[in-house]
């Protein structure tokens, strides 16, 4: 019931996977099943499209597998980290993702600069 209250108040929900594996060690078909099965189950329960997924342990697969997963599923955002979680880890470090070669300067300006310019204008 708490999740329904959040959804009714404009919050969104995401998934974590079906069986909590280390996703950086999975082949695409298994990774896809982990994400899709969890997404379908949650989406069906709350009659809502699930757009977000977070990797267990923060363990991300390769960039190409992530790109393929986003292309073939309804997931739009995949959250994870590329390094181990330890007490020495900087909690506010923002990890950068690799960019696809098709991500040109126009797209870079559109997605990285324009959102900030709107606040300045």
Where are these regions (language model features)?
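Acidic (Asp/Glu)-rich catalytic clusters
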Residues: 1-14, 44-46, 88
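Histidine-centered divalent metal-coordination motifs
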Residues: 16, 20
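C-terminal active-site subregion of NodB/CE4 polysaccharide deacetylases
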Residues: 25-52, 57-121
């Amino acid at each position: 019931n708490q999740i329904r209250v959040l959804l009714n108040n404009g919050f969104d929900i995401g998934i974590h996977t079906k069986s909590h594996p280390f996703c950086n060690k999975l082949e695409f078909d298994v990774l896809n099943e982990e994400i899709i099965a969890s997404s379908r189950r949650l989406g069906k329960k709350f009659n809502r499209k699930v757009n977000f997924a977070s990797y267990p342990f923060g363990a991300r697969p390769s960039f190409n597998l992530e790109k393929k997963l986003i292309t073939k599923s309804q997931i739009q955002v995949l959250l994870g980290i590329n390094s181990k979680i330890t007490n020495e880890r900087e909690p506010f470090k923002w990890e950068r993702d690799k960019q696809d070669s098709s991500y040109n300067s126009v797209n870079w300006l559109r997605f990285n600069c324009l959102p900030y310019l709107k606040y300045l204008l």
